Regions:
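Metal/cofactor- and membrane transport-associated sequence elements
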Residues: 1-113
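Alpha-helical coiled-coil heptad-repeat oligomerization segments
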Residues: 56-60, 99-110, 174, 190, ...
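RNase H-like nuclease module associated with reverse transcription
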Residues: 122, 244, 262, 274, ...
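Structured nucleic-acid-interacting core domains from mobile-element enzymes and related host factors
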Residues: 226-251, 316-318
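Mobile genetic element proteins and their domesticated derivatives, centered on retroelements
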Residues: 2, 18, 42, 54, ...
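C-terminal reverse transcriptase regions that engage the nucleic-acid substrate
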Residues: 40, 88, 116-234, 369
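Two-metal-ion RNase H-like nuclease active-site motif
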Residues: 1-3, 244-257
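Polymerase palm active-site segment centered on the conserved acidic dipeptide of motif C
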Residues: 65-68, 93-138, 143, 318-321
Length: 370
């Protein structure tokens, strides 16, 4: 669904005034201004006012707002479940209750000016296709537009998004157009929605947004050459007969030569399908590889718990405990062993958090080879 003129429906709680538009001023009323009762496009309050109005309408229908993700609404009944996801004025409705979905669409039509776009094929730049294997998400058109804009549509493809063991630094000749670099990295960052294979490269390149150098630009071009090789690559979601949650966690150690911080990474699978992933530099310096891996495990557990809570809230049964895989034996021992010692006592908070989830039976750990 698409809501027409969505922001104009929002009710303003603040006092906001505007000048009268040209040609609207009546004789003798020059100098008067209008007080807004509804939000307008361009007001900083408009998105919040619109979301509040839309939330009230859904709650009136009987939908509940998810506590784990406020952009997700759900309703459970004897006929099944209805799920609604909203991003500003773009809406996706799905579920196992066809009659309920039809009733919800009719209800929204009475509240707002809506347009039913039919079966989901395109949403926020993400292309959705269906086959016997499952649902496939990609951003092929987005990639091709990006390559054309960057002048790389005819570029020679390469096999990796970043040169192996590449060490970027802040030193070097600055880019002639840093704004162009920032725009490119911003667009690549949005592409990671369906391309986890470039998540690490984009994470590294985004650390040099303030003063990008020519070396940084060349590294960004490497990502474009990699995308040229497979612009339609994406993620397939299929039915594999189970709903187990698995998470793979990893980290390097002191990988950044400038501040010696480590980079964490994880990917979360539900029912054999990849649903969440991230690559990010850690906030503190780790004193050992085990500590770096353990901090990555703590971040992974946070994401696993969030996924579990969201699925449980909307009525999707998942198998517990979730499995957390790591390739560092020392980090796994820290997670399962309640004993503190000199090398781990300063990461006490992370220790308590991960161990608590293990003791509660929500998480089990396992070793996987590098």
């Amino acid at each position: 669904l698409d809501i027409k003129n969505a922001f104009l429906h929002g009710d303003l709680q603040e006092e906001v005034y505007m000048e009268q538009p040209p040609g609207f001023v009546a004789p003798g009323e020059y100098g008067k201004v209008c007080r807004l009762n509804k939000s307008l496009y361009g007001l900083k309050q408009s998105p919040r006012a619109w979301f509040g109005k839309f939330s009230q309408a859904l709650e009136k229908f009987g939908m509940q707002k998810s506590k784990s993700d406020h952009s997700v609404f759900y309703k459970q009944s004897h006929g099944g479940i209805i799920l609604l996801v909203v991003y500003v004025d773009d809406i996706v409705i799905t579920g196992s209750d066809p009659r309920g979905i039809s009733s919800l669409k009719s209800f929204l039509t009475t509240q707002f000016h809506t347009q039913d776009l039919g079966m989901l094929k395109y949403f926020l730049g993400v292309e959705v296709s269906r086959s016997k294997k499952g649902i496939f998400l990609s951003q092929r058109k987005y990639v091709l537009d990006l390559l054309m804009e960057s002048g790389k549509l005819g570029a020679k493809p390469c096999s990796t998004p970043m040169v192996p063991n590449l060490q970027l630094t802040k030193e070097g000749e600055l880019c002639a157009d840093p704004e162009r670099y920032r725009r490119l990295i911003g667009k690549l960052n949005y592409l990671t929605v369906t391309r986890p294979d470039i998540a690490y490269s984009v994470s590294v390149l985004s650390q040099y947004m303030s003063s990008p150098t020519i070396d940084h630009w060349k590294a960004a071009e490497q990502v474009l050459h990699y995308l040229k090789g497979a612009p339609g690559r994406g993620i397939l979601y299929g039915n594999y007969g189970h709903t187990r949650i698995e998470c793979f966690s990893d980290s390097d150690w002191a990988g950044c030569k400038e501040d010696r911080r480590s980079t964490s990474g994880y990917c979360v699978f539900v029912g054999g399908n990849l649903v969440s992933w991230k690559s990010k530099k850690q906030n503190v310096v780790s004193r050992s590889s085990a500590e770096a891996e353990y901090r990555a495990m703590a971040k992974s557990v946070c994401e696993v718990i969030w996924v579990y809570q969201l699925l449980s809230e909307v009525g999707i049964k998942v198998s517990v405990p979730a499995k957390l895989w790591c390739d560092n034996q020392a980090a796994l021992h820290i997670a399962s062993n309640p004993v503190f010692h000199e090398r781990t006592k300063h990461i006490e908070i992370d220790c308590h958090f991960v161990r608590e989830k293990i003791q509660q039976g929500l998480i089990t750990t396992g070793y996987v080879k590098t």
